[in-house]
C-alpha cells in the first residue's frame, strides 16, 4: 500500500497547481485523476472553454514555472476592457496604460493551462500522477486517511485535497453541506470571427435578460464568447441555423466589431452557484470548484480557485516546516477562514452585479447606467475596480 503526505483527488487546473506548488517542500504528493492527459496539437482550433487569467493567477503560474510554457503555446494578452448596457448611455472602459500596467490579463484555453501544469507535475520526482484512477472508498482515520481505488489498490495520506470539481465526490463523502443556487441562466460558448480586429480588448454587454462577453484570442479576428441567457433562449440559440445565430449575435453585440460569424460548435451548460459550508475538515481541504462555483460573468472562476491553491500551498509548507500535522482541522482552519471570506465576497459581488444588470425594468436600467457612468468618470474608482479584477487585493504573502 502506497503512503503519501498529500493525496490530491482531481487533476484539473487547480489540483495540479497545488501539486506543483508543493514540489520540493519535502511533502510526498499523489494526484488521482480519472482521465489520462491527451497531447495538445499545436494546430488544433481554439478550444471552447477559456479563462481570463488575471495578474494574481499569472504570478502564481510564473512561480510554479509553467507560465512561459503557456505563453509559448497559445495565450492572448488583453490591454483593455469595455462594459456597456445595450441601448442606453451606461458605459465604462479601462485600458492598461492609463492605469500604469503593461496588460490587464490573458485569455487562455483551459486545455493549454492544464497541459502545462500536467507536464510540470509529470517531471517532478516528488509528485506521483495516478491516471486513470477513480476513488471508490474513503475512510477518515485519526492519523491518516485510507483511500481505495476502483482497481482495488489502496493509498494512505495524511491530508486529502478535494479538487474534484463542482459535484465533488469527496465533499459529499465528508458530509459537508452546500449552499446552492440556480442562476436560471445557461451559458453558451463558441468561437466567433469578427469583421474588425478586436484590438486586444475584452468586451461585455448587458442586454435585457442576457450578458454577452467577447474575449479576444491570439488571432486579431477571433473571439471566444460566453453568452449568458435564459435556459430556453440558450437552447434555441444552440440549435438555430448559423445565419439565424449570427443575426441574433450581431444585434445583441451592437455590431461593435462589424459582422460576426460563428466558427465553431456551440456548447451550452447550466450556471449554478455553490458555496461549501466548510472548506476544510479533519484530514480534508477543498479547493476550486469543489469549494465554490460562481457565475462566469468575468471568467473569474479559475482565478478564485488558483488563489485557493496559492493559500493552501503556503499554509501546508508552513505547517510542514514547523513540524505540525498538516491534516489536523485546527491547523487547516486558517486556510479555510481566509478563502471562505474571499469566495463569499466574490460570490456576493457577482450576485449583486447580476441582479443589477438583469431585466429591463426602466428604473433599474437608469440606476445601472448612472452607476456605470459614475464609475467611468469619478476619480479613484477605476483603479480600485481594476485592482480587484486583476486579483491584486487578494494575493497571499508569498506572491506579493
Curated annotation (Swiss-Prot):
FAD binds at residues 49-52, 297-303. Pathway: Cofactor biosynthesis; ubiquinone biosynthesis. GO terms for cellular component: cytoplasm; ubiquinone biosynthesis complex. Gene3D superfamilies: FAD/NAD(P)-binding domain. This is 2-octaprenylphenol hydroxylase. It catalyses: 2-all-trans-octaprenylphenol + NADPH + O2 + H(+) = 3-(all-trans-octaprenyl)benzene-1,2-diol + NADP(+) + H2O; a 2-(all-trans-polyprenyl)phenol + NADPH + O2 + H(+) = a 3-(all-trans-polyprenyl)benzene-1,2-diol + NADP(+) + H2O. Keywords: Cytoplasm, FAD, Flavoprotein, Monooxygenase, Oxidoreductase, Ubiquinone biosynthesis. The keyword Flavoprotein applies. Its main location: cytoplasm. The keyword Transport does not apply. FAD-dependent monooxygenase required for the aerobic hydroxylation of 2-octaprenylphenol to 2-octaprenyl-6-hydroxy-phenol, the first hydroxylation step in coenzyme Q (ubiquinone) biosynthesis. Homotetramer. Component of the Ubi complex metabolon, which regroups five ubiquinone biosynthesis proteins (UbiE, UbiF, UbiG, UbiH and UbiI) and two accessory factors (UbiK and the lipid-binding protein UbiJ). SUPFAM superfamilies: FAD/NAD(P)-binding domain (SSF51905). Its cofactor is FAD. It is found in: Cytoplasm. Belongs to the UbiH/COQ6 family. One of its GO terms (biological process) is ubiquinone biosynthetic process. The gene is ubiI. Disruption phenotype: Cells lacking this gene have a low level of coenzyme Q8 in aerobic conditions, and accumulate a compound derived from the Q biosynthetic pathway which was identified as 3-octaprenyl-4-hydroxyphenol. When grown anaerobically, they have a content of Q8 comparable with that in wild-type cells and do not accumulate 3-octaprenyl-4-hydroxyphenol. The levels of the isoprenoid naphthoquinones, demethylmenaquinone and menaquinone (MK8) are not affected in the deletion mutant under aerobic conditions. It comes from Escherichia coli (strain K12).
Amino acid at each position: 500500500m502506497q503512503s503519501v503526505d498529500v493525496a490530491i483527488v482531481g487533476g484539473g487546473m487547480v489540483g495540479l497547481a497545488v501539486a506543483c506548488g508543493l514540489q520540493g517542500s519535502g511533502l510526498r504528493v499523489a494526484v488521482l485523476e480519472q482521465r489520462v492527459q491527451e497531447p495538445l496539437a499545436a494546430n488544433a482550433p481554439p478550444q471552447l472553454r477559456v479563462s481570463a487569467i488575471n495578474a494574481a493567477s499569472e504570478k502564481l503560474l510564473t512561480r510554479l514555472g509553467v507560465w512561459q510554457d503557456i505563453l509559448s503555446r497559445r495565450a492572448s494578452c488583453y490591454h483593455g476592457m469595455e462594459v456597456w448596457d445595450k441601448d442606453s448611455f451606461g458605459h465604462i472602459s479601462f485600458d492598461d496604460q492609463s492605469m500604469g500596467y503593461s496588460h490587464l490579463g490573458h485569455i487562455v484555453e483551459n486545455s493549454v493551462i492544464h497541459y502545462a501544469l500536467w507536464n510540470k507535475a509529470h517531471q517532478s520526482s516528488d509528485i506521483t500522477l495516478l491516471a486513470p484512477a477513480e476513488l471508490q472508498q474513503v475512510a477518515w482515520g485519526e492519523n491518516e486517511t485510507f483511500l481505495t481505488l476502483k482497481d482495488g489498490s489502496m493509498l494512505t495520506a495524511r491530508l486529502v485535497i478535494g479538487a474534484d470539481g463542482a459535484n465533488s465526490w469527496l465533499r459529499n463523502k465528508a458530509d459537508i453541506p452546500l449552499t446552492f443556487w440556480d442562476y436560471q441562466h445557461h451559458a453558451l460558448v463558441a468561437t466567433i470571427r469578427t469583421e474588425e480586429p478586436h484590438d486586444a480588448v475584452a468586451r461585455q454587454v448587458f442586454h435585457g435578460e442576457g450578458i454577452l462577453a467577447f474575449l479576444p484570442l491570439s488571432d486579431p479576428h477571433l473571439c471566444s464568447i460566453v453568452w449568458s441567457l435564459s435556459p430556453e433562449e440558450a437552447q434555441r440559440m444552440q440549435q438555430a441555423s448559423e445565419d439565424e445565430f449570427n443575426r441574433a449575435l450581431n444585434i445583441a453585440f451592437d455590431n461593435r466589431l462589424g459582422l460576426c460569424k460563428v466558427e465553431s460548435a456551440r456548447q451550452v451548460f447550466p450556471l449554478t452557484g455553490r458555496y461549501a459550508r466548510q472548506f476544510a475538515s479533519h484530514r480534508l481541504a477543498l479547493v476550486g470548484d469543489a469549494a465554490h462555483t460562481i457565475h462566469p460573468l468575468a471568467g473569474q472562476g479559475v482565478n478564485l480557485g488558483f488563489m485557493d491553491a496559492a493559500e493552501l500551498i503556503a499554509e501546508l509548507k508552513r505547517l510542514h516546516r514547523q513540524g505540525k500535522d498538516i491534516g489536523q482541522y485546527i491547523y487547516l482552519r486558517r486556510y479555510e477562514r481566509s478563502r471562505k471570506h474571499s469566495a463569499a465576497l466574490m460570490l456576493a459581488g457577482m450576485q449583486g452585479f447580476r441582479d443589477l444588470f438583469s431585466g429591463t425594468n426602466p428604473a433599474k436600467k437608469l440606476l445601472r447606467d448612472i452607476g456605470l457612468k459614475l464609475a467611468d468618470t469619478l476619480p479613484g474608482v477605476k483603479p480600485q475596480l481594476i485592482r480587484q479584477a486583476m486579483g491584486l487585493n487578494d494575493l497571499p504573502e508569498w506572491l506579493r
